[in-house]
């Protein structure tokens, strides 16, 4: 879906070593088909190898890396040891440093470049000014990538132990339960079953993060030196991938032509389920503007379209029934 709606590349996970353990990840045969499909469209596939593996997992890495060498367009890596192993066992594949590695300065970026990295996905905590300075002090051959849309983590670039502590599911091994996005109530020890809402207007909203949206700031990101934009897509619906990818495709193309963003594409990003949007750490520290907890969406799926008639009009094959007084707007 992402490729159909304008993505230049997609990232996906194999059966192991990916940061979405509960997702329907790709086995070897599915991976081969996905890579062939993307390459047939002139697009690229980056395979995630971005968990922090434990000692007893290292023996499986060489075979995993050798299997992908020369077929995947890049490997996304979050561990220094895995980066070294990838240079040895996947010498024909470009190496991308994951945002999980927390790169936030030029010294780290240069060191990783010397270790063989082709691309560094900067930490979400990097500001616009940080990016400008990193670009000015790194080799031009090193590509810089940045997340521009998706969830914000309460910990530094996703290195969080909250999920592990509360559920036994390790966020650093692809099993995050996202407890930072749960709704919590307070129960007093001697009043079991009585739950009190937590209201703390004078305190912290760290467990209540917003979603990042940078579609309005694409020209500035390009000017700062970002070579590619990354959208959170795994564990999202096909609808989400289509809507958000399409909006950013038009936003990027407009920026490259020197044209302003059309309001319709900003409006499109409101049509998926999301938390209130913010610009992350790009311009300042988010601080206390994490005040609203609920997800929101301003649109429902009204029909599924699988074909067009001879005049290019959509032919819906299934419908969602509208309730009384609801309207459907044709775009």
PLM features per residue range, with description:
Residues 11-29, 49-56, 235-239:
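Glycine-rich, proline-tolerant flexible connector loops at the mouths of alpha/beta enzymes
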Residues 94-224, 241:
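Catalytic alpha/beta core domains of metabolic enzymes, predominantly
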Residues 320-327:
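Conserved small/polar residues in nucleotide/adenosyl-binding loops
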Residues 10-12, 45-49, 75-77, 95-99, ...:
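Hydrophobic faces of well-ordered beta-strands that scaffold small-molecule active sites
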Residues 23-32, 80-86, 125-138, 238-240:
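Active-site-adjacent beta->alpha loops and helix N-cap segments on the catalytic face
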Residues 2, 79, 112, 146, ...:
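Conserved, mostly hydrophobic/aromatic
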Residues 130-133, 142, 232-292:
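Anionic-ligand-binding alpha/beta catalytic cores of soluble enzymes and soluble regulatory domains
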Residues 25-89, 94-99:
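Active-site beta->alpha loop and helix N-cap motifs at the rims of alpha/beta catalytic domains
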């Amino acid at each position: 879906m992402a490729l159909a709606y304008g993505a230049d590349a997609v990232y996906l996970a194999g059966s192991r070593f990916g940061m979405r353990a509960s997702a329907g990840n790709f086995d070897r045969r599915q991976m081969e088909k996905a890579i062939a499909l993307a390459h047939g469209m002139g697009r690229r596939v980056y395979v995630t190898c971005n968990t922090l593996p434990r000692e007893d997992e290292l023996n499986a890495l060489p075979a995993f890396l050798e299997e992908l060498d020369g077929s995947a367009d890049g490997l996304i890596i979050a561990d220094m040891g895995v980066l070294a192993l990838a240079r040895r066992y996947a010498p024909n594949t470009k190496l991308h440093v994951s945002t999980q590695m927390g790169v936030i300065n030029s010294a780290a970026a240069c060191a990783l470049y010397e270790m063989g990295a082709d691309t560094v996905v900067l930490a979400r905590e990097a500001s616009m000014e940080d990016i400008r300075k990193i670009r000015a002090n790194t080799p031009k051959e090193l590509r810089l990538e940045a997340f521009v849309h998706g969830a914000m983590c309460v910990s530094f670039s996703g290195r969080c132990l909250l999920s592990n502590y509360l559920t036994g599911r390790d966020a650093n091994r692809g099993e995050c339960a996202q407890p930072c996005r749960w709704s919590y109530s307070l129960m007093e020890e001697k009043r079991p079953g009585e739950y009190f809402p937590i209201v703390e207007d004078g305190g912290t909203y760290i467990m209540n993060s917003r979603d990042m949206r940078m579609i309005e700031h694409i020209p500035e990101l390009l000017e700062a030196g970002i070579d590619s934009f990354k959208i959170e897509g795994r564990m999202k619906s096909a609808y989400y991938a289509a809507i958000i990818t399409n909006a950013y495709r038009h936003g990027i193309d407009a920026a490259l032509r020197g044209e302003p963003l059309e309001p319709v594409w900003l409006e499109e990003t409101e049509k998926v389920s999301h938390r209130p949007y913010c610009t992350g750490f790009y311009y300042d520290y988010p601080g206390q503007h994490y005040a609203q907890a609920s997800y929101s969406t301003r649109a429902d799926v009204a029909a599924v379209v699988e074909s067009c008639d001879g005049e290019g009009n959509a032919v819906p094959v299934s419908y969602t029934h509208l309730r009384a007084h609801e309207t459907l707007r044709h775009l």
